[in-house]
Amino acid sequence: MLVEKVQLGDQKAFNLLVIRYQHKVASLISRYVPQGDVPDVAQEAFIKAYRAIGSFRGDSEFYTWLYRIAVNKANIYLVAQ
């Protein structure tokens, strides 16, 4: 599983996760923030996911976990505006 490889430090596996989910995350974030800011907020979500990947326990699907991170980053963006 890609997530397990990332948890073991495999950078290429994380790149594959980004490629796999970047459009879904961008689409999700675009519901909350102006289109011009979507790439920045999506990048922040992926950075947060990378830094916190060790806390992913697999109790849910990876995208469910990433979805929550992306929504939280969008909300943080909105509060800051």
Region spans (language model):
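Arg/Lys-rich amphipathic alpha helix in sigma70-family domain 2
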Residues: G54-R57, V71-Q81
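Intrinsic, short, N-terminal disordered tails of RNA polymerase sigma-factor systems
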Residues: M1-E4
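Short acidic-aromatic loop segments in the C-terminal HATPase_c
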Residues: Y50
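Structural recognition of an alpha-helix C-terminal capping motif at a helix-to-coil junction
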Residues: D40-I47, S60-N72
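A short, glycine- and basic residue-enriched loop/turn
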Residues: Q11, P39, I53-D59, Y63
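Short, charged helix-capping/linker segments at alpha-helix termini
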Residues: Q7-L16, A26-E44
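Hydrophobic/aromatic residues within well-ordered alpha-helical segments
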Residues: L17-Y21, V25, A70
